Every structure is written in C-alpha cells, then in structure tokens.
Amino acid sequence: RDIRVPGRDASGIYFAVDFLSRNTKSLLDSNLTDGKAVSAKDKNVVIIGGGDTGTDCVGTSIRQGCRSVTQIEIMACPPDKRASNNPWPEWPMTYKQDYGQQEATLVAGADPRRWLTTVTAINKNDKGEVVSVDTVKVSWQKTEKGFAPIPVEGTAETLPCDLLLIAMGFVGPETPVMDAFGMERTPRGLPLMATT
C-alpha cells in the first residue's frame, strides 16, 4: 500500500520490504560492502505503519545508527490491560513493545511510535530529496461509510526526515503469476479455490 500525499515523488522514500530486502541481501552477499544497502546511518528516519514490517524497519534503522527514528501509527495506543470486550481466549489487544521499539527505547529513551497520527505532506529540498514530513493527529469518527480518521485541528507538526519508509500493509496478492497460469480470482483478488 502506498501513500498519496504531496511530495510523494521525493527521493529517499522506500517501501519497507524493499528497504529490508536490499539491506539483508547486501549483508548476506557482501557484508554491506557492495553499496546496494539503503543506509539509515546518521539519518532522521520516519516509518509510516505500525505492524511487524514497521517494527523490522525500526530495529534495522537503530542498528544502522540512525540519528532518530519515528514510527507513525494511525491507530490509537492500546490499553495496558485487556478491555472488557477483549476476553481470553482472544488475542490480547494491549500495549506492548516488540523488539524494534524496545531497541529504540533503550537508545533514545522513549517508544518511537506516534499514535493517532498521519502524514499529510512530504517536504523536499531543491534536489528533490525528502527533508521532512508534515503530520497531524487524527480522531476516529463514525461517517456514513464507517469509521474514518479525521484530522484534529491545531495538531499539525513537521518532523525532520532524511529517509522515509512506507510500511502501511499489503493490498492483496501479486497478480502476474496468477494471470500467467490463468487462475480465477475472487472480487478481493485472492485465488478462487475449487469447492468439493
């Protein structure tokens, strides 16, 4: 999934999986000497997305020696304890830090996540390189189409950013392989399975 905001065409923006794959391949192939890795060293890194892939980006950025790392999460911070509507044996929807946030907390002294926040614009310099991102806090409100994140007035902020990583999740499976084999798909793009 991509982000559609002004400045998206700036250089220094990578999809999270590309960032992680290039770094891992360069490490395995050449111990990072082939120049193919995307380095976060001495950079202000902003990661859009709060899932496992975003966590991997936080951990990798910390290990590469980034100047700062901020993880933008559009959802609210979960509670410390289970809510009454989240009983066992359901997965506990509670606040936790995965390894990436734990490493960032040890290095920087705080959880890198900014909850209920979204990026509204990407700012670039004269060379077209990302230099900062504009953000705003959101409030989830019911609309005629369901719940939607609505910007909260007076919460705009600009964060320094030399490296922007997009970890916003996946929209669906890649279709070229399914097309090559003539596979039928559901309306959501998933392979249509035969029923018996």
Which residues make up each language-model segment?
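Short hydrophobic core segments
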Residues: R1, V46-I48, V119, D162-G169
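Short amphipathic alpha-helical segments
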Residues: I3-G7, V58-T60, P176-A180
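FAD-site-proximal beta/loop scaffold in flavoenzymes
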Residues: S11-D42, Q141-T196
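Beta1/beta-strand and adjacent pyrophosphate-binding region of the FAD-binding site
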Residues: K41-G51
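Cofactor-binding loop segments of dinucleotide-utilizing enzymes, especially the Rossmann-like FAD-
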Residues: G50, E73-C77, K124
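N-terminal Rossmann-fold NAD(P) dinucleotide-binding loop
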Residues: G54
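Rossmann-like dinucleotide-binding cores of NAD(P)H-dependent redox enzymes
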Residues: V58-T118
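A conserved short coil-to-beta-strand element within the FAD-binding core of flavoproteins
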Residues: L116-E129
